[in-house]
């Protein structure tokens, strides 16, 4: 098995409902270790840049508005098959389709306000982590 990194964003809806600790605890219980973390309020430019691949899609403006509506917690997580493991913990994008016990089933209210973001591939994770964290802000876990 490969040790990977993935990007996780706890979105404004979950932050606003005080689910940060519960969500991070689930990642850690699954063996995903935070190696970088920021609590921040995304600017419009940051949100537009991060979601640039969706710029031509109909939901882009609403997505940017939502992601800038309150603070988020951005983390780089490290662990065995981190991308897939993280996505399994999150559950389906649509919380109505998410398996019971997943983050989106437990904390999300809609496909638009779905509690968290997770990288969809190792390549995406590398790009997304670099978007938010400089190399000197990432600290591999040695203990």
UniProtKB/Swiss-Prot annotation:
BP-aspect Gene Ontology terms: CTP biosynthetic process; GTP biosynthetic process; UTP biosynthetic process
One Gene Ontology cellular component annotation held by this UniProt entry: cytoplasm
Alphabetical keyword list: ATP-binding, Cytoplasm, Kinase, Magnesium, Metal-binding, Nucleotide metabolism, Nucleotide-binding, Phosphoprotein, Transferase
GO function terms (MF aspect): ATP binding; metal ion binding; nucleoside diphosphate kinase activity
Cell compartment(s), UniProt: Cytoplasm
Record-listed ATP binding positions: 11, 59, 87, 93, 104, 114
Reaction(s) catalysed (UniProt annotation): a 2'-deoxyribonucleoside 5'-diphosphate + ATP = a 2'-deoxyribonucleoside 5'-triphosphate + ADP; a ribonucleoside 5'-diphosphate + ATP = a ribonucleoside 5'-triphosphate + ADP
Cofactor: Mg(2+)
Stretches of the chain forming a coiled coil according to its record: none
Highest taxon above the source species: Bacteria
Enzyme Commission no: 2.7.4.6
Record-annotated active site: 117
Xref: Pfam families: NDK (PF00334)
InterPro entries tied to this protein: NDK-like_dom, NDK-like_dom_sf, Nucleoside_diP_kinase, Nucleoside_diP_kinase_AS
Family: Belongs to the NDK family.
Function, in words: Major role in the synthesis of nucleoside triphosphates other than ATP. The ATP gamma phosphate is transferred to the NDP beta phosphate via a ping-pong mechanism, using a phosphorylated active-site intermediate.
Binding partners and assembly: Homotetramer.
Protein name from the UniProt record: Nucleoside diphosphate kinase
């Amino acid at each position: 098995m490969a040790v990977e990194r993935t990007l996780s964003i706890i979105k404004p809806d979950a932050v606003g409902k005080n689910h940060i600790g519960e969500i991070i605890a689930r990642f850690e219980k699954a063996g995903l270790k935070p190696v970088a973390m920021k609590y921040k309020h995304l600017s419009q430019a940051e949100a537009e840049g991060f979601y640039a691949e969706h710029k031509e899609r109909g939901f882009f403006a609403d997505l940017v508005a939502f992601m800038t509506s309150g603070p988020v917690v951005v983390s780089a997580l490290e662990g065995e098959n981190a991308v897939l493991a993280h996505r399994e913990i999150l559950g389906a994008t649509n919380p109505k389709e998410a398996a019971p016990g997943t983050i989106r089933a437990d904390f999300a209210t809609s496909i638009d306000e779905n509690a968290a973001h997770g990288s969809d591939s190792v390549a995406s994770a590398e790009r997304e982590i670099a978007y938010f964290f400089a190399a000197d802000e990432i600290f591999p876990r040695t203990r």
